[in-house]
Amino acid sequence: MSDFLIIGGGVIGMMTALQLADAGQNITLVERGACGKEASWAGGGIVSPLYPWRYGEPVSQLSRWSEGVYPTLALRLLEETGIDPEYRQKGLLYLNVDDDDAALHWARQLGKPLERVDASFVHQKEPEAAAPGGSALWMPTLGSVRNPRLGQALRARLAAMPNVTLIEQCSVQGFIQRQGRVVGVDTNQGEQLAEQLVVCGGAWAAQLLEGLNVRLPVRPVKGQMIAYQAPPGLVQRVVLKDGRYVIPRSDGLLLVGSTLEEAGFDKATDEEALVSLKRSAENIIPALADCPVAHHWAGLRPGSPEGIPFIGALPDFPNVFINAGHYRNGLVLAPASTHLLVDQLLGRKPLMDPAPYQPTAARLA
């Protein structure tokens, strides 16, 4: 029997497992598919909410703490696994921002570098970017990570740890209860028992918890993205315009996203989204009209009310914990939300006030 059973092998589940394993706990992690291959793979990897000043304090608090973790985490994983998560801090250009006064006020309150810039500044930073039609902002400290590589590195590190057992292609079929207490799960690979359970199921978390008659308000929200194969160096930093973004990778791939679709668990791609994403991409970087689209894919975000994740123990099952519902910001919030959960699991002083994230009866109603 493990100390902890983690259900879900995305970035949230794997970071939870890593922190618990670092603390000497025995961990079993079960994943219905392959670790790091759902939303953790499908996203863009920007280590910030797209427009951070538009979020409430619960999301902002997690984001602020998490942003500072990625440089060290990426170096650690590269050293331990040889896989480079490609954390890069080259800043972000916001084009056509209609609430720039609010953004600058937010930045001043936090002491965060953010400045209003003109078309010549934009051209200096990104010569191929379209001239901004309205206000433009520059955030020099923003970073991004190559999230598929981050997932690979986390999985490789966990697989090498003697106190971690990874079980992939392992579907949870129900919870095992004895004398009113949850002691494990039934899976297609047999029973898995543990003292404490952590549900990190992303968009599937609500489905999992139906087995305990818990109604978790987390739903799948589809996002489609495309990637261009462009000459290396065409774009150097993240550029965001009208809610869509271009993210450069070191090998010349340029990611463009993303749609927001209420489509259940459907992950199919379609021509309408492709046309829309190409139009957005060419409005940001006109030269992309001459570059081929190399990839088109979709992922499922775990949508939740106000994008505030559920982090903590279930009211009626004190040894069953949740860490789910991060919506568009799973990668962004993962270091802080997993640290906060592990604080609760190990009885440590919490990183921050856990109250806004607790899965209370009121939030589950």
Where are these regions (language model features)?
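N-terminal Rossmann-like FAD-binding beta1-loop-alpha1 element of flavoenzymes
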Residues: 2-29
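Active-site substrate-recognition segment that forms the wall
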Residues: 15-23, 45-47, 83-88, 181, ...
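Glycine-rich FAD pyrophosphate-binding loop
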Residues: 21-43
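Dinucleotide-binding Rossmann-like beta1-alpha1 core, especially the glycine-rich loop
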Residues: 46-125, 280-282
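Short beta-strand to alpha-helix junction loop
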Residues: 61-64, 94-100, 138-156, 268-273, ...
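Helix-loop-beta segment of a Rossmann-like dinucleotide-binding subdomain
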Residues: 82-94, 105-108, 113-161, 183, ...
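C-terminal catalytic lobe of FAD-dependent flavoproteins
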Residues: 285-365
